[in-house]
């Protein structure tokens, strides 16, 4: 287990914590990370695309000309696919793009993403993160004091309305709870900041 500094919101050291190597110290599995990101992105798709086939296009109920005697090719409707304004063949229909991944793979992906951030020195542990009231300015000052990059993911152990409201209007800052921890947010962030309580909760689940 590796020792990691625990910081206060003013940047001073509050102590240290031993990170579980099974969660924060494994060799990142790039393939599983790739699969987990694909799964998340697929689940985000709306899937509301739709086109009209020959039965859905308005009109075309009358046969355009008689079957025989005209010398022309036989036609049953002006909404057949070969006609201008006709229906679409095998077009997209509304569907869900989401699919499932085994639980062990999902957890391995989370451990891989967290371990990668630790290896990149893009991981910070805070003693706690609380506000008496929504204070965007204080939150912004904290990110400056801690010298955090533009894209930061804050992970807290439980939902805190004041923290969420304080960070909501700051570009590039995302606040989630441990239950909402996901690979896409971790990978997209330049820095992951977790509270000590959040680290303990994550280790309890993934360790």
From Swiss-Prot:
User: Per the record, which residues fall in region Disordered?
Assistant: 50-76
**Classification via Pfam families:** Ribosomal_L4
Q: Name one GO biological process term.
A: translation
**Keyword set, alphabetical order:** Ribonucleoprotein, Ribosomal protein, RNA-binding, rRNA-binding
The record's listing under InterPro entries reads: Ribosomal_uL4, Ribosomal_uL4-like, Ribosomal_uL4_dom_sf
One GO CC term, this protein: ribosome
Q: Cite the Gene3D superfamilies for this sequence.
A: 3.40.1370.10
Alphabetized GO MF terms: rRNA binding; structural constituent of ribosome
Q: How does it assemble?
A: Part of the 50S ribosomal subunit.
Q: Which family does it belong to?
A: Belongs to the universal ribosomal protein uL4 family.
**Task performed by this protein:** One of the primary rRNA binding proteins, this protein initially binds near the 5'-end of the 23S rRNA. It is important during the early stages of 50S assembly. It makes multiple contacts with different domains of the 23S rRNA in the assembled 50S subunit and ribosome. Forms part of the polypeptide exit tunnel.
Q: What is the name listed in the Swiss-Prot or TrEMBL entry for this protein? A: Large ribosomal subunit protein uL4
Species this protein is from: Macrococcus caseolyticus (strain JCSC5402)
